[in-house]
């Protein structure tokens, strides 16, 4: 006899919702294996809890820009002690909490609805810091005003929209060398783990050091000396151990025993432990900041209307000179690599990549929603919106369709009214979650071609630079430049030596060409050119039709092999004892464990 969850999953799968989102059992010719309604809901909740910290963290960072608040104190140009200015900042922070939750809700819901991908969007970490501390400056001390910076973000979004509409972003992701695409997933996993170890968004196990880039932390923040934990105080912070044992070890054990919702359980348990005040692990210490946070937490249900950040764009571009253009270009190249790399890695993590075309279903809509969300977010007063690597938390819980992202969007919508609760999830509650997700993502390192240095070195540079520069974009840039330089030099040497000087193991290299299957033009343009009236709908002649993902992977492997040796066939597998063995993908391996 079927239990209630199976009955619900089967009923939804047979409905129009099941066919729309291609749930398992829906009868859709491209239904996604393992995609079940209740699993998608749980995955969406997991993604939300993993990235709920962005509500308070993004608001805190953007408040440091000063927003539209005006500082007129000549003696104190940053107005740190100006009462009126700081009161304005308090209003600004509440505005940013509402704005962050609102744009995250809208963008994540639309991403799931239109692209059917389990990828959530929100104002990006790193981009918000660049926006605040480099472009606008602390309390408006930078070269560009808050309004002009928002204008740069607004324009950037529409440039992205054009690039997405005409297929350039999709082509960039598909034309990227395979070793770089695989390494980006590993690098993002390491990047997530590093975030999970920090104080700002993790358990606080590491800090910076005077002599080394990072060192062991774990002390109470008040005991730090110049941002470094003294020797005797390291690993003495009670919140660190609550995060490790309740948010990490317990979650791992639950996952080992296949307990559904293990990640959510860990986050909720640590949060509940951290809310009471008279404890050593409280998130609300008896300080000015703690009192203010606790007063906000006690409201539980409230709605704060945005008062100061709506539509603050300034269009007098001459006042900033070249600084406006510099900010726009920087936002463009950082965001295009960051978001494109993240989306591709998340699509691979959930098993949605077609190995034949190196694209994923709904990519055009995914990139378009991302682009429009950037411009809409700027109208709310926010820094650029981007795909969140924390989406991997939901994917690791089994999320495979847009229902996951839509659930996350609904949670962000609810959080607008319950912002005191969701803004009070401590970073040590989600830190171990990020580390666990990172550990799942680095498994694709086994698929990187380590035998040929022309592929291995660029891949390693990419995955190493990402966490240590705290930037996905910089890692991709470093990896791509290294790949181009090494392989160009190899080609030059071969030409000059008439093919006599060939690097070791070159026959094992991954094939690459800029002529990707399907060409540069997006699917909707090709369908329109064929005279298809409903050109926005995919059909059997699309690059993702016909063979499907599984056959596509095999076709891609054979196409890459050419007429050469057996080892060249091995695009997505390893050779053991003369036989080619195809490893499980990350999503397949998780399904097996679940």
Outline where the language-model segments fall.
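Membrane-embedded alpha-helical modules
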Residues: 137-269, 406-538
